[in-house]
Every structure is written in structure tokens, then in C-alpha cells.
Amino acid sequence: MKQYNILMIMADQMHKYALGKIAPYVKTPNLDRLAGEGTLFRNAYSNNPVCGPFRGILYSGMYSRDNGVQKNDEALSETEVCLPQELQKCGYTTSFVGKLHLGGSGNQPIPKKYWAGHEHFLGYQCYNG
């Protein structure tokens, strides 16, 4: 079976009409090409609109009340099995680039325990408080 590449792009507060593939008056040629060659979710909803808790839900597959990330500045448990670890079991190499927002300090290197299971990490934390 062919193993496909998985590229997950997360943007904070990006409305669906900020993508040219859906709203032609917006120019996003690279994102449009990715959406045209991959999967585009036209009706996706978040059950938690806050950055850190949503990322905790996405990575753990559990509601905020169950994964322990109910507000920004909280981290997933070190024992939590996350999406990157499940992908590794299927032979994928996982990497993260950008803002993770799942624990650690915005002013210090991020300890591996906060990498949400990624093998490679080039990221930072961002706290809005």
C-alpha cells in the first residue's frame, strides 16, 4: 500500500473565506494548490476555539476536559499518546515547525516532553498574556 505524505497546516483564527480555493477574491496560490491536490475540509468545526486547547484536542483525540488542556499555557500529559506517535507506528517520520502552544515557556527552549510526540521539532511557544 502506498504511504502518502501528510501535511497539516494550522493557522490561528483563519476564516474559511481567507482561502482562495473557496473565496476567489483572495489570492493564496500555494495553499490553493495544496488544497486542490489533497483534502480540503469545507465544513470543519472546532469544539474549542482557543489555540492551546484545540491543539490538545487535535493531538490527543480527546475533549479538553479529558486531555487536561482547558486553557492556554497548559500542556498535554507526558504519558498521553499523541497523533505523531500513532503515525510513527505506521512508519511515518514526524516533524513540527512553527507555534505549538502546548506547554513550555515562550522565552526558553522547549523541552522534548512538550513536543507532543514529534521526532523533529523546530518550534516556539507563544503566550498572549
Where are these regions (language model features)?
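Formylglycine-dependent sulfatase
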Residues: 1-129
